[in-house]
């Protein structure tokens, strides 16, 4: 701390609102790095899966084609969006996705696939990380320095994941065949473990984000009655939205439905904020809509692969009907036992 104070003594006096803008930018950068790491790891898993399927070599070639400029644009745009997005709307986005994710996971037994969750949660994950940082560093004496440390660590993880993604796209086929590279051999043996690892990491991230989101929203209320006037319509609105979207996605799991779901969610949140929110929240909802659409466009190829994989899993795993013993009857002097299939 003495070194920081000594170093800060040489800096000119800067207004407090400037440091607030810097902190928002740093929080947005950490959130953008988290989204990019999730994107890179999911891309590695889907690329290896497509390589192992002779019918998906075209998709593997599309995943192999990477652009450094597009990745830089992706991180930069998300950083700008998260830095402009208010913590209140970001917290609402996190809570809405958490409720929707629980509904989707519970409906897996009814035939709905869940592999798209890693891509559908991208923007919500960034909102959760930014919201958590805003809550955890509230009132911290050295908030900017802590956020700089978080940016350094997140950028290091992003660089390593981007490096692995690039290496796998170029050398995985050769190294896995020649048994040459340790990274490629590890992925050859354990690439199936990437989704469970991401699932556990997302559970922890959204658990912390949900707690921070509730705290961020409640800090604006002066009394319990005021909080209840906000939470009651919010809970009803979110519950109805989740039920409606879940039914629509099961009946029509298409690319158009994914974008339609985003507009329905943001439209419902917009109406809610016009009723119990502030005018700044309405502007932040449009910013959130831009971020959601951008994340879906950037992951368009991967979403299509996941959607096809979910459809193939449902086709290849038909429900098995249990066998029960039916009535016993006699024909031609012999006693036969009839077996009947009971539909589930």
From Swiss-Prot:
Residue ranges crossing the lipid bilayer per the database entry: 18-38, 75-95, 117-137, 139-159, 201-217, 228-244, 257-277, 282-302
Annotated Gene Ontology cellular component terms: membrane
The keyword Repeat is assigned to this record: no
Primary subcellular site in the record, as a coarse category: membrane
Mode of membrane association: Multi-pass membrane protein
Keywords: Membrane, Transmembrane, Transmembrane helix
Entry annotated with the keyword Transmembrane helix: yes
Localization annotation: Membrane
The family this protein is said to belong to: Belongs to the TMEM82 family.
Stated name of the protein: Transmembrane protein 82
Species name: Xenopus laevis
């Amino acid at each position: 701390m003495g070194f920081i104070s000594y170093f800060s003594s040489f800096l000119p006096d800067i207004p407090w609102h400037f440091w607030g803008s810097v902190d928002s930018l740093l929080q947005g950068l950490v959130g953008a790095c988290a989204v990019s790491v999730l994107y890179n790891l999911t891309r590695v898993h889907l690329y290896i899966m497509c390589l192992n399927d002779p019918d998906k070599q075209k998709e593997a070639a599309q995943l192999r084609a990477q652009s450094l400029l597009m990745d830089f644009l992706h991180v930069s745009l998300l950083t700008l969006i998260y830095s402009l997005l208010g913590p209140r709307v970001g917290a609402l986005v996190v809570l809405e996705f958490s409720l929707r994710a629980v509904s989707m996971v519970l409906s897996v037994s009814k035939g709905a696939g869940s592999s798209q969750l890693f891509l559908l949660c991208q923007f919500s994950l960034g909102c959760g990380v930014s919201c958590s940082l805003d809550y955890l560093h509230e009132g911290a004496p050295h908030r900017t320095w802590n956020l700089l440390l978080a940016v350094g660590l997140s950028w290091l993880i992003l660089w390593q994941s981007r490096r692995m993604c690039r290496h796998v796209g170029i050398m995985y086929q050769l190294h896995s065949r020649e048994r040459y590279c340790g990274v490629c051999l590890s992925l050859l043996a354990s690439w199936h473990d990437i989704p469970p690892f991401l699932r556990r990491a997302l559970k922890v991230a959204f658990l912390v984000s949900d707690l921070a989101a509730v705290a961020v929203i409640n800090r604006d209320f002066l009394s319990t009655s005021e909080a209840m006037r906000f939470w009651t319509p919010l809970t009803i609105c979110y519950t109805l939205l989740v039920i409606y979207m879940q039914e629509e996605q099961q009946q029509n799991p298409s690319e158009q439905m994914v974008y339609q779901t985003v507009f329905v969610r943001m439209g419902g949140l917009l109406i809610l904020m016009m009723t119990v929110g502030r005018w700044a929240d309405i502007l932040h909802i449009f910013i959130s809509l831009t971020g959601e659409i951008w994340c879906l466009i950037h992951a368009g190829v991967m979403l299509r692969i996941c959607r096809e994989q979910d459809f193939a899993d449902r086709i290849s795993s038909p429900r098995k009907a249990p066998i029960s013993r039916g009535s016993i009857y006699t024909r031609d002097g012999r006693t036969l036992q009839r077996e009947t299939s009971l539909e589930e």
